[in-house]
Protein backbone atom coordinates (compact mmCIF):
# COMPACT_ATOMS: atom_id res chain seq x y z
CA UNK A 1 0.00 0.00 0.00
CA UNK A 2 1.45 3.32 -1.07
CA UNK A 3 1.59 6.02 1.62
CA UNK A 4 -0.81 8.96 1.40
CA UNK A 5 0.33 12.10 3.20
CA UNK A 6 -1.65 15.34 3.51
CA UNK A 7 -0.25 18.74 4.47
CA UNK A 8 -3.05 20.93 5.83
CA UNK A 9 -2.01 24.59 5.68
CA UNK A 10 -4.34 27.14 7.27
CA UNK A 11 -4.61 30.22 5.06
CA UNK A 12 -3.67 33.62 6.58
CA UNK A 13 -4.31 32.01 9.94
CA UNK A 14 -4.10 34.82 12.51
CA UNK A 15 -6.24 37.28 10.58
CA UNK A 16 -8.62 34.48 9.55
CA UNK A 17 -9.11 33.69 13.24
CA UNK A 18 -9.97 37.34 13.85
CA UNK A 19 -12.48 37.24 11.00
CA UNK A 20 -14.38 34.42 12.72
CA UNK A 21 -15.28 36.77 15.58
CA UNK A 22 -15.48 40.05 13.67
CA UNK A 23 -17.36 39.76 10.39
CA UNK A 24 -16.61 43.42 9.59
CA UNK A 25 -13.08 42.31 8.63
CA UNK A 26 -14.37 40.04 5.85
CA UNK A 27 -13.85 41.39 2.35
CA UNK A 28 -11.70 44.39 3.35
CA UNK A 29 -7.90 44.71 3.69
CA UNK A 30 -7.00 43.65 7.23
CA UNK A 31 -3.97 42.50 9.19
CA UNK A 32 -2.82 41.41 12.63
CA UNK A 33 0.06 43.59 13.79
CA UNK A 34 1.91 44.81 16.87
CA UNK A 35 0.49 48.17 17.89
CA UNK A 36 -2.31 49.53 15.67
CA UNK A 37 -2.85 52.71 17.72
CA UNK A 38 0.77 53.86 17.43
CA UNK A 39 1.29 52.39 13.93
CA UNK A 40 4.29 50.48 15.22
CA UNK A 41 5.28 46.82 15.32
CA UNK A 42 5.32 44.31 12.48
CA UNK A 43 2.66 42.56 10.44
CA UNK A 44 2.07 39.05 11.77
CA UNK A 45 -0.58 38.10 9.20
CA UNK A 46 -2.41 39.85 6.38
CA UNK A 47 -5.53 38.70 4.57
CA UNK A 48 -5.61 38.29 0.81
CA UNK A 49 -7.29 41.67 0.26
CA UNK A 50 -4.32 43.35 1.98
CA UNK A 51 -1.80 41.20 0.14
CA UNK A 52 -3.08 42.54 -3.17
CA UNK A 53 -1.61 45.89 -2.12
CA UNK A 54 1.79 44.29 -1.45
CA UNK A 55 1.39 43.87 2.33
CA UNK A 56 3.50 40.96 3.59
CA UNK A 57 4.14 39.19 6.86
CA UNK A 58 7.13 40.58 8.85
CA UNK A 59 6.79 43.98 7.14
CA UNK A 60 6.79 46.93 9.54
CA UNK A 61 3.28 48.19 10.14
CA UNK A 62 4.26 51.70 9.12
CA UNK A 63 5.42 50.48 5.70
CA UNK A 64 2.35 48.27 5.31
CA UNK A 65 0.04 51.23 5.94
CA UNK A 66 1.90 53.26 3.33
CA UNK A 67 1.05 50.53 0.81
CA UNK A 68 -2.52 50.15 2.03
CA UNK A 69 -3.68 53.19 4.07
CA UNK A 70 -7.24 51.83 4.41
CA UNK A 71 -6.11 48.54 5.94
CA UNK A 72 -7.81 47.65 9.23
CA UNK A 73 -5.30 46.54 11.86
CA UNK A 74 -6.06 44.44 14.94
CA UNK A 75 -3.67 43.58 17.80
CA UNK A 76 -2.52 39.96 18.17
CA UNK A 77 -4.34 37.59 20.51
CA UNK A 78 -2.08 34.54 20.68
CA UNK A 79 -4.21 32.76 23.25
CA UNK A 80 -7.15 32.90 20.85
CA UNK A 81 -5.01 31.66 17.96
CA UNK A 82 -3.76 28.72 20.03
CA UNK A 83 -7.36 27.92 20.93
CA UNK A 84 -8.38 27.95 17.25
CA UNK A 85 -5.32 25.87 16.33
CA UNK A 86 -6.32 23.31 18.95
CA UNK A 87 -9.82 23.23 17.45
CA UNK A 88 -8.33 22.56 14.01
CA UNK A 89 -6.16 19.72 15.32
CA UNK A 90 -9.09 18.18 17.17
CA UNK A 91 -11.14 18.27 13.98
CA UNK A 92 -8.33 16.69 11.97
CA UNK A 93 -8.10 13.84 14.48
CA UNK A 94 -11.51 12.64 13.23
CA UNK A 95 -9.82 11.64 10.00
CA UNK A 96 -6.60 10.03 11.27
CA UNK A 97 -4.81 9.59 14.60
CA UNK A 98 -1.44 10.09 12.91
CA UNK A 99 -0.97 13.86 12.94
CA UNK A 100 2.25 15.85 13.13
CA UNK A 101 1.65 19.51 13.90
CA UNK A 102 4.58 21.38 12.39
CA UNK A 103 3.44 24.85 13.46
CA UNK A 104 0.39 26.64 14.83
CA UNK A 105 -1.18 26.64 11.35
CA UNK A 106 0.19 23.52 9.64
CA UNK A 107 -0.01 19.78 10.14
CA UNK A 108 0.88 16.62 8.26
CA UNK A 109 -1.68 13.82 8.26
CA UNK A 110 -0.91 10.20 7.43
CA UNK A 111 -4.06 9.21 5.54
CA UNK A 112 -2.71 5.85 4.38
CA UNK A 113 -5.43 3.18 4.41
CA UNK A 114 -8.36 5.56 4.94
CA UNK A 115 -9.80 5.30 1.42
CA UNK A 116 -12.61 2.95 2.50
CA UNK A 117 -13.66 5.52 5.11
CA UNK A 118 -13.34 8.82 3.27
CA UNK A 119 -12.91 7.97 -0.40
CA UNK A 120 -10.02 8.84 -2.69
CA UNK A 121 -7.40 11.29 -1.38
CA UNK A 122 -8.87 14.30 -3.20
CA UNK A 123 -12.35 13.44 -1.89
CA UNK A 124 -11.02 13.10 1.66
CA UNK A 125 -9.24 16.44 1.34
CA UNK A 126 -12.47 18.08 0.19
CA UNK A 127 -14.29 16.66 3.22
CA UNK A 128 -11.62 18.06 5.55
CA UNK A 129 -11.58 21.47 3.88
CA UNK A 130 -15.37 21.80 4.00
CA UNK A 131 -15.45 20.55 7.61
CA UNK A 132 -12.94 23.21 8.68
CA UNK A 133 -14.74 25.95 6.75
CA UNK A 134 -18.26 25.09 7.92
CA UNK A 135 -17.52 24.26 11.56
CA UNK A 136 -14.60 26.59 12.35
CA UNK A 137 -15.05 29.37 9.79
CA UNK A 138 -11.43 29.00 8.62
CA UNK A 139 -9.83 28.41 5.25
CA UNK A 140 -7.10 25.95 4.38
CA UNK A 141 -5.15 24.52 1.49
CA UNK A 142 -4.25 20.83 1.32
CA UNK A 143 -1.34 19.18 -0.46
CA UNK A 144 -1.45 15.45 -1.20
CA UNK A 145 1.43 13.11 -2.01
CA UNK A 146 3.38 10.04 -0.92
CA UNK A 147 5.72 12.06 1.29
CA UNK A 148 5.97 15.14 3.47
CA UNK A 149 8.10 17.23 1.11
CA UNK A 150 5.90 16.82 -1.96
CA UNK A 151 2.72 17.36 0.06
CA UNK A 152 4.22 20.60 1.38
CA UNK A 153 5.09 21.74 -2.14
CA UNK A 154 1.60 20.80 -3.30
CA UNK A 155 -0.07 22.81 -0.52
CA UNK A 156 1.65 25.97 -1.76
CA UNK A 157 0.48 25.56 -5.36
CA UNK A 158 -3.08 26.76 -4.88
CA UNK A 159 -4.14 29.23 -2.17
CA UNK A 160 -6.57 29.92 -0.67
CA UNK A 161 -8.91 26.92 -0.51
CA UNK A 162 -6.80 24.77 -2.80
CA UNK A 163 -6.47 21.00 -3.07
CA UNK A 164 -3.45 19.82 -5.04
CA UNK A 165 -2.16 16.32 -5.69
CA UNK A 166 1.54 15.96 -6.46
CA UNK A 167 2.57 12.32 -6.87
CA UNK A 168 6.05 11.10 -7.73
CA UNK A 169 4.87 10.11 -11.19
CA UNK A 170 4.00 13.76 -11.88
CA UNK A 171 7.13 15.52 -10.68
CA UNK A 172 8.67 15.99 -14.13
CA UNK A 173 5.57 17.81 -15.41
CA UNK A 174 4.34 19.56 -12.24
CA UNK A 175 7.41 20.07 -10.03
CA UNK A 176 10.43 20.36 -12.28
CA UNK A 177 9.20 23.37 -14.33
CA UNK A 178 8.87 25.46 -11.13
CA UNK A 179 11.47 28.06 -10.21
CA UNK A 180 14.15 26.71 -7.87
CA UNK A 181 13.27 29.71 -5.67
CA UNK A 182 9.87 28.13 -4.94
CA UNK A 183 11.36 24.87 -3.68
CA UNK A 184 10.68 24.33 0.01
CA UNK A 185 14.01 24.82 1.77
CA UNK A 186 15.61 27.17 -0.78
CA UNK A 187 16.22 30.62 0.68
CA UNK A 188 17.65 33.80 -0.79
CA UNK A 189 21.32 32.88 -0.32
CA UNK A 190 20.88 29.38 -1.75
CA UNK A 191 18.93 30.77 -4.67
CA UNK A 192 21.64 33.32 -5.43
CA UNK A 193 24.26 30.57 -5.47
CA UNK A 194 22.21 28.28 -7.71
CA UNK A 195 21.20 31.17 -9.98
CA UNK A 196 24.87 32.09 -10.46
CA UNK A 197 25.44 28.53 -11.70
CA UNK A 198 22.60 28.75 -14.21
CA UNK A 199 20.22 26.62 -12.16
CA UNK A 200 16.82 28.26 -12.59
CA UNK A 201 14.27 25.47 -12.14
CA UNK A 202 13.81 22.50 -9.85
CA UNK A 203 14.31 20.36 -12.93
CA UNK A 204 17.72 21.95 -13.54
CA UNK A 205 18.76 20.91 -10.05
CA UNK A 206 17.24 17.44 -10.38
CA UNK A 207 19.25 16.85 -13.54
CA UNK A 208 22.56 17.51 -11.81
CA UNK A 209 24.72 14.58 -10.88
CA UNK A 210 24.27 13.69 -7.23
CA UNK A 211 27.95 14.37 -6.53
CA UNK A 212 27.65 17.83 -8.08
CA UNK A 213 24.66 18.65 -5.85
CA UNK A 214 26.73 17.60 -2.85
CA UNK A 215 29.72 19.62 -3.97
CA UNK A 216 27.62 22.76 -4.47
CA UNK A 217 25.59 22.71 -1.24
CA UNK A 218 27.05 19.95 0.93
CA UNK A 219 24.70 17.60 2.79
CA UNK A 220 21.87 20.07 2.27
CA UNK A 221 22.44 19.67 -1.48
CA UNK A 222 21.89 15.92 -1.20
CA UNK A 223 18.64 16.50 0.69
CA UNK A 224 17.45 18.90 -2.02
CA UNK A 225 18.52 16.45 -4.73
CA UNK A 226 16.48 13.64 -3.17
CA UNK A 227 13.48 15.92 -2.69
CA UNK A 228 13.68 17.09 -6.30
CA UNK A 229 13.33 13.43 -7.27
CA UNK A 230 10.40 12.93 -4.92
CA UNK A 231 12.42 10.87 -2.45
CA UNK A 232 11.34 11.51 1.14
CA UNK A 233 10.81 8.70 3.63
CA UNK A 234 10.50 10.91 6.72
CA UNK A 235 7.50 9.55 8.67
CA UNK A 236 4.65 11.59 10.08
CA UNK A 237 5.49 11.62 13.79
CA UNK A 238 2.87 11.94 16.49
CA UNK A 239 4.22 14.13 19.30
CA UNK A 240 2.40 13.75 22.60
CA UNK A 241 1.92 16.98 24.58
CA UNK A 242 2.32 14.94 27.79
CA UNK A 243 5.92 14.13 26.91
CA UNK A 244 7.09 17.63 27.72
CA UNK A 245 10.89 17.69 27.81
CA UNK A 246 10.99 21.21 26.45
CA UNK A 247 8.69 24.05 25.49
CA UNK A 248 9.68 25.83 22.32
CA UNK A 249 8.38 28.08 19.61
CA UNK A 250 9.89 28.94 16.26
CA UNK A 251 8.83 30.73 13.14
CA UNK A 252 10.02 30.65 9.56
CA UNK A 253 10.10 34.19 8.24
CA UNK A 254 8.47 34.84 4.87
CA UNK A 255 11.30 37.29 4.20
CA UNK A 256 14.88 36.98 5.41
CA UNK A 257 15.65 39.51 8.17
CA UNK A 258 18.83 41.10 9.53
CA UNK A 259 17.24 43.92 11.56
CA UNK A 260 17.71 43.04 15.24
CA UNK A 261 14.78 45.31 16.18
CA UNK A 262 12.40 43.21 14.11
CA UNK A 263 14.00 39.96 15.28
CA UNK A 264 13.81 40.87 18.95
CA UNK A 265 10.12 41.70 18.59
CA UNK A 266 9.53 38.25 17.09
CA UNK A 267 11.70 36.68 19.81
CA UNK A 268 9.67 38.33 22.57
CA UNK A 269 6.43 37.22 20.93
CA UNK A 270 7.73 33.62 20.96
CA UNK A 271 8.88 33.95 24.59
CA UNK A 272 5.46 35.27 25.63
CA UNK A 273 3.95 32.07 24.29
CA UNK A 274 6.59 29.87 25.92
CA UNK A 275 6.25 31.61 29.28
CA UNK A 276 2.47 31.27 29.36
CA UNK A 277 2.69 27.58 28.43
CA UNK A 278 5.38 26.95 31.06
CA UNK A 279 3.31 28.65 33.76
CA UNK A 280 0.19 26.79 32.70
CA UNK A 281 1.99 23.46 33.18
CA UNK A 282 3.99 24.71 36.19
CA UNK A 283 7.28 23.95 34.43
CA UNK A 284 10.39 25.91 35.44
CA UNK A 285 13.29 25.41 33.06
CA UNK A 286 17.00 26.03 33.47
CA UNK A 287 18.21 25.89 29.86
CA UNK A 288 17.31 28.50 27.25
CA UNK A 289 18.15 27.52 23.67
CA UNK A 290 18.23 29.90 20.70
CA UNK A 291 18.05 28.57 17.15
CA UNK A 292 18.90 30.67 14.11
CA UNK A 293 18.68 29.40 10.55
CA UNK A 294 20.34 31.67 8.02
CA UNK A 295 19.23 32.26 4.45
CA UNK A 296 21.86 29.77 3.25
CA UNK A 297 20.32 27.17 5.61
CA UNK A 298 23.16 27.00 8.07
CA UNK A 299 21.72 26.40 11.52
CA UNK A 300 23.25 27.43 14.82
CA UNK A 301 22.04 26.37 18.25
CA UNK A 302 23.24 28.30 21.28
CA UNK A 303 22.12 27.67 24.82
CA UNK A 304 22.72 28.96 28.29
CA UNK A 305 21.84 27.80 31.79
CA UNK A 306 20.03 30.15 34.12
CA UNK A 307 18.13 29.91 37.37
CA UNK A 308 15.03 27.72 36.98
CA UNK A 309 12.25 29.97 35.71
CA UNK A 310 8.98 30.24 33.85
CA UNK A 311 9.12 34.03 33.75
CA UNK A 312 8.65 35.45 30.26
CA UNK A 313 11.20 38.25 30.56
CA UNK A 314 13.89 36.00 32.04
CA UNK A 315 13.48 33.60 29.11
CA UNK A 316 13.47 36.53 26.69
CA UNK A 317 16.52 38.26 28.19
CA UNK A 318 18.53 35.05 27.93
CA UNK A 319 17.42 34.53 24.34
CA UNK A 320 18.02 38.17 23.40
CA UNK A 321 21.51 38.10 24.88
CA UNK A 322 22.31 35.05 22.74
CA UNK A 323 20.77 36.78 19.72
CA UNK A 324 23.01 39.83 20.17
CA UNK A 325 26.07 37.62 20.55
CA UNK A 326 25.47 35.43 17.53
CA UNK A 327 23.53 37.51 15.00
CA UNK A 328 25.72 38.37 12.03
CA UNK A 329 24.34 41.57 10.44
CA UNK A 330 25.68 40.44 7.07
CA UNK A 331 23.82 37.12 7.09
CA UNK A 332 20.00 37.30 6.86
CA UNK A 333 17.94 35.08 9.16
CA UNK A 334 15.25 32.80 7.73
CA UNK A 335 14.09 31.10 10.94
CA UNK A 336 14.28 32.02 14.60
CA UNK A 337 13.37 29.72 17.46
CA UNK A 338 13.68 29.65 21.22
CA UNK A 339 12.97 26.96 23.79
CA UNK A 340 13.28 26.25 27.49
CA UNK A 341 14.16 22.85 28.91
CA UNK A 342 15.83 21.21 31.88
CA UNK A 343 12.64 21.38 33.91
CA UNK A 344 12.89 21.12 37.66
CA UNK A 345 10.40 19.99 40.26
CA UNK A 346 8.94 23.19 41.71
CA UNK A 347 9.34 21.72 45.19
CA UNK A 348 13.13 21.71 44.76
CA UNK A 349 14.88 24.89 45.99
CA UNK A 350 16.22 27.08 43.19
CA UNK A 351 19.88 26.59 42.37
CA UNK A 352 22.49 29.28 41.90
CA UNK A 353 22.70 30.40 38.28
CA UNK A 354 25.76 29.22 36.37
CA UNK A 355 25.02 31.74 33.66
CA UNK A 356 28.51 33.17 33.57
CA UNK A 357 27.91 36.56 32.00
CA UNK A 358 28.40 39.30 34.55
CA UNK A 359 26.66 42.00 32.54
CA UNK A 360 23.65 39.81 31.94
CA UNK A 361 23.44 38.64 35.55
CA UNK A 362 23.16 42.25 36.70
CA UNK A 363 19.83 42.60 34.91
CA UNK A 364 16.86 43.10 37.21
CA UNK A 365 14.79 40.44 35.47
CA UNK A 366 16.93 37.52 36.61
CA UNK A 367 15.61 35.97 39.79
CA UNK A 368 13.15 38.80 40.24
CA UNK A 369 9.94 37.58 41.88
CA UNK A 370 8.26 40.85 40.90
CA UNK A 371 8.39 39.81 37.24
CA UNK A 372 6.77 36.49 38.03
CA UNK A 373 3.96 38.32 39.82
CA UNK A 374 3.53 40.55 36.77
CA UNK A 375 3.31 37.44 34.58
CA UNK A 376 0.66 35.93 36.84
CA UNK A 377 -1.42 39.12 36.78
CA UNK A 378 -1.11 39.36 32.98
CA UNK A 379 -2.09 35.70 32.59
CA UNK A 380 -5.11 36.24 34.82
CA UNK A 381 -6.27 39.31 32.89
CA UNK A 382 -5.78 37.59 29.54
CA UNK A 383 -7.57 34.43 30.65
CA UNK A 384 -10.54 36.41 31.93
CA UNK A 385 -10.83 39.26 29.44
CA UNK A 386 -8.81 38.21 26.38
CA UNK A 387 -5.20 38.51 25.25
CA UNK A 388 -5.74 41.87 23.61
CA UNK A 389 -6.60 43.58 26.91
CA UNK A 390 -3.01 43.84 28.11
CA UNK A 391 0.38 43.85 26.37
CA UNK A 392 4.01 44.62 27.10
CA UNK A 393 5.45 47.96 26.06
CA UNK A 394 8.51 45.93 25.03
CA UNK A 395 6.49 44.53 22.12
CA UNK A 396 6.39 47.95 20.46
CA UNK A 397 8.97 48.70 17.77
CA UNK A 398 9.67 52.39 17.63
UniProtKB/Swiss-Prot annotation:
The annotated active site, in chain numbering, is: 106
Q: What's the chief localization of this chain? A: cytoplasm
Keyword Cell membrane listed? The answer is: no
- In its UniProt entry, what is this protein called? DNA polymerase IV
Tagged with keyword Transferase: yes
Query: What is the source species?
Result: Alkaliphilus oremlandii (strain OhILAs) (Clostridium oremlandii (strain OhILAs))
Protein keywords: Cytoplasm, DNA damage, DNA repair, DNA replication, DNA-binding, DNA-directed DNA polymerase, Magnesium, Metal-binding, Mutator protein, Nucleotidyltransferase, Transferase
Q: What does this protein do?
A: Poorly processive, error-prone DNA polymerase involved in untargeted mutagenesis. Copies undamaged DNA at stalled replication forks, which arise in vivo from mismatched or misaligned primer ends. These misaligned primers can be extended by PolIV. Exhibits no 3'-5' exonuclease (proofreading) activity. May be involved in translesional synthesis, in conjunction with the beta clamp from PolIII.
**Reactions catalysed, as given in the entry:** DNA(n) + a 2'-deoxyribonucleoside 5'-triphosphate = DNA(n+1) + diphosphate
Family the entry assigns: Belongs to the DNA polymerase type-Y family.
Amino acid sequence: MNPVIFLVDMNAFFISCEMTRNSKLIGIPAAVAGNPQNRTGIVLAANYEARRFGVKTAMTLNNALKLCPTMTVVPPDHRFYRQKSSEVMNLLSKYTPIIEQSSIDEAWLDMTGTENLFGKPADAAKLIMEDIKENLGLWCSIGISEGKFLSKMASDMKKPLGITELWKRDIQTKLWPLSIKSMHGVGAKTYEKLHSLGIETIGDFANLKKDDAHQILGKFGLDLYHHAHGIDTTPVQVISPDDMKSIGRSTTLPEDLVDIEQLKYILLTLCEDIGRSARKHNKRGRTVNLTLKSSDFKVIHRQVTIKATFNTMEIYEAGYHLLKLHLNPKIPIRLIGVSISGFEDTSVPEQISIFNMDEFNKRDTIGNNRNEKIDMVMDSIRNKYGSDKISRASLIIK
